[in-house]
A protein has these predicted regions:
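N-terminal secretory targeting modules
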Residues: 1-69
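Membrane-embedded segments
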Residues: 68-152
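Loop/turn elements at helix/coil->beta-strand transitions in domains of secreted/extracellular proteins
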Residues: 70-71, 94, 121-124, 219-226, ...
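Second-shell loop/turn segments in exported
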Residues: 98-103, 197-204, 239-242, 278-279
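Well-ordered, non-membrane alpha-helical segments in soluble/globular domains
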Residues: 110, 204-212, 243-253
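Secreted/periplasmic serine-hydrolase-like ester/acetyl group-modifying domain
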Residues: 124-221
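Active-site segments of SGNH/GDSL-like serine hydrolases
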Residues: 215-242
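C-terminal regions of proteins
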Residues: 243, 247-300
């Protein structure tokens, strides 16, 4: 019996140490307590690489929002990375939570709505999206892993990706790990990726049905639903035209207009022509984004 107990303890010890290490570092601030790694470092490492950004960012935000839910949220993709929620709050006098996730797609955005709706008495929901997000080719999963890890302390402490993030945070704090920067060929890379996305475009009626279900819930609960289409550079619009996507874009915009209040800044327009106002063809400069924010929340 004693030998069996010792064997069990020896087998369990490495797992206990791993779980203890994860709890100590607390890579996604689940326990919201002291950690040897500063909060700023753990938050910065959400953007460590393009491969991990979707999972890491969504995990962090699911945990953070559950701890302190608010009534107004904006849900979207990487184009909300530089979105200044504090600027919106300074205009409206209301807290706004930014649920923007790099790599976010329509399924994850709509599931985020239901998650937030389960935790808060929502009053205003802004959905930042774009034509590219409404293709059936964009129906991939980034939700399940983060949602599982955020669901309980046991899940959190035993999740492989949480362990990986804890190791990353430790190396960033005590070592010399550096986050990926913006590559010199960022523009060309984004354009190439966007062409591949647009070439695979196919209507996604199940996305439309789920959006209508969200809109129905908003009407039922008295939630104001606003859809925001941020600017993209005209090089994207030229590709859309070249690929014959005009009818698909028109149908997409009609769906948005018929479902909720629709703020369409996507272009083509004067603000989508100036390359200097863009980090790459899909992502605006902070200055241009702040101008759009002021137009939406303050009016012309």
């Amino acid at each position: 019996m004693n030998r069996l107990l010792r064997w069990i303890l020896l087998v369990a010890l490495p797992f206990a140490l791993l779980m203890g290490g994860v709890a100590w570092v607390d890579p996604f601030n689940y326990f919201d307590g002291p950690s040897p790694v500063p909060l700023e470092t753990r938050r910065a490492n959400l953007r460590h690489s393009g491969a991990t950004m979707p999972h890491y960012t969504l995990t962090w935000k699911l945990i953070e929002f559950r701890r302190a839910p608010v009534a107004d949220i904006i849900i979207g993709d990487s184009r909300l990375t530089r979105f200044d929620a504090a600027l919106v709050s300074s205009i409206t006098g209301r807290a706004l939570y930014n649920f923007g996730v790099p790599g976010g797609n329509t399924p994850s955005m709509l599931r985020t709505f239901w998650y937030a709706d389960s935790l808060a008495r929502l009053e205003t929901v802004y959905l930042q999206t774009g034509f590219r997000n409404w293709s059936a080719a964009q129906d991939y999963d980034i939700w399940e892993g983060p949602a599982w890890a955020a669901a309980s302390a046991v899940h959190y402490l035993t999740d492989r990706d949480v362990l990986g993030k804890a190791w990353l945070d430790a190396r960033a704090h005590w070592g010399s790990v550096q986050a990926e920067g913006i590559a010199d060929d960022q523009w060309a890379t984004v354009i190439g990726n966007e062409r591949a996305v647009l070439e695979q475009y196919a209507p996604a009626p199940h996305f439309a049905a789920e959006l209508r279900r969200v809109a129905a819930r908003c009407r039922e609960r008295g939630i104001r639903l606003v859809i925001i289409d941020l600017p993209v550079h005209d090089e994207v619009h030229r590709m859309e035209e070249e690929l014959g996507l005009g009818a698909g874009i028109a149908a997409y915009k009609e769906l948005m207009r018929s479902t909720a209040a629709y703020c369409d800044f996507s272009g083509p327009s004067a603000i989508t022509a100036d390359r200097a106002q863009y980090i790459d063809a899909l992502h605006t400069s902070k200055a241009l984004l702040e101008g759009v924010i002021r137009e939406i929340w303050q009016g012309p």
